[in-house]
Regions:
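Acidic, polar-rich low-complexity tracts and alpha-helical solenoid repeat scaffolds
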Residues: 2-6, 13, 21-308
Length: 308
């Protein structure tokens, strides 16, 4: 089960599948005209508002001029893409590059092939093609989109937290890279939003495993999982429960100062949470109160992320 039900729509909006053309400065992107080389900046990307309206980064589905040798191959691949024959389209764009490697359309064909692979759910092939585009054309004006396509291809593959989450980690790495490489762009904004969900998913996996260990009375193993959430995924929705579980587990082990610290940090940051109410009640059964030990790893980990 994927967590990104709307991500395909988002990518289509970014890639601009309208046939009506594009009124933005990016009308030549991929489909509006032949390759013109580098842009020197990713700042020409559309605003997030444009992405939501579907008017930014419009493909335009520009065809190659019939007088060009590449025209027949490229335009046939483009036609297949428009009709939804994505596998055939990908092969057609690959053939454009193979037969006309020095054509101004060959560069664009690589990314069009990557997009076609993505649309047929061929995520690994889409990633490989986009990575190849980046390797061959690192300074191209469309390189930011190639990075975005890679990230979304990983993101689409995120599975239920009961499954292996290695692809989620790859998605998060790719999404974070976009934010670092292309800040202040619509790509970065969307990547940041998706990264929040990816981190929450990884935290959910840690909690799932931690609860299992707790149920099996493997308390130290459970603590390590909850500890990971507090240290690595502190800003996710799973943190209140992780702090409660630490209270519960340390209490069961008789490590009361850590149990009290976990409850105190929980109460200070989520005072209205049901998890805090449960933690407080648990401590009261032993005649204890939430008290933060500043030397506790919990206190130090929290201060490292939220100082002050």
């Amino acid at each position: 089960m994927k967590i990104a039900a709307f991500s395909r729509f988002a990518l289509i909006v970014v890639f601009g599948l309208s046939l009506a053309g594009c009124s933005t400065s990016m009308s030549d992107l991929l489909g509006g005209g032949p390759d013109t080389g580098t842009s020197g900046s990713a700042d020409s990307t559309a605003s997030s508002g444009e992405l939501k309206r579907g008017t930014g980064l419009n493909l335009g589905f520009g065809q190659a001029e019939e007088s060009e040798p590449v025209a027949k191959l490229y335009n046939k691949a483009l036609e297949d893409l428009q009709k939804g024959y994505y596998r055939t389209a990908a092969k057609g764009f690959d053939e454009v590059e193979r037969q006309h490697p020095y054509s101004q359309w060959a560069t664009r064909a690589i990314l069009m092939a990557a997009y076609s692979q993505y649309m047929r759910n061929g995520y690994d092939d889409a990633i490989n093609a986009a990575e190849r585009f980046i390797t061959l054309h690192p300074g191209h004006k469309d390189t930011p989109y190639a990075y975005y396509l890679i990230a979304i291809s990983y993101y689409e593959q995120i599975m239920d937290i009961k499954r292996d989450q290695s692809v989620t980690e790859k998605a998060l790495t790719a999404l974070d890279e976009i934010s670092v490489r292309f800040p202040n762009t619509a790509y970065a904004q969307d990547a940041a939003n998706k990264a929040i969900l990816a981190r929450d998913h990884l935290a959910g996996k840690e909690m799932e495993v931690g609860r299992y260990y707790l149920k099996e009375n493997s308390l130290l193993a459970a603590i390590n999982r909850f500890k990971t959430v507090v240290i690595k995924y502190q800003t996710t929705t799973h943190t209140p429960e992780a702090l409660y579980r630490l209270t519960e587990t340390y209490y069961a082990l008789g490590v009361m100062n850590e149990a009290q610290t976990a409850a105190a940090v929980l109460g200070a940051n989520y005072p209205s949470s049901d998890w805090y109410k449960d933690a407080y009640s648990l401590l009261k059964t032993g005649g204890l109160e939430p008290v933060e030990n500043k030397d506790s790893w919990i206190s130090k980990a929290w201060k490292a992320v939220t100082p002050g």
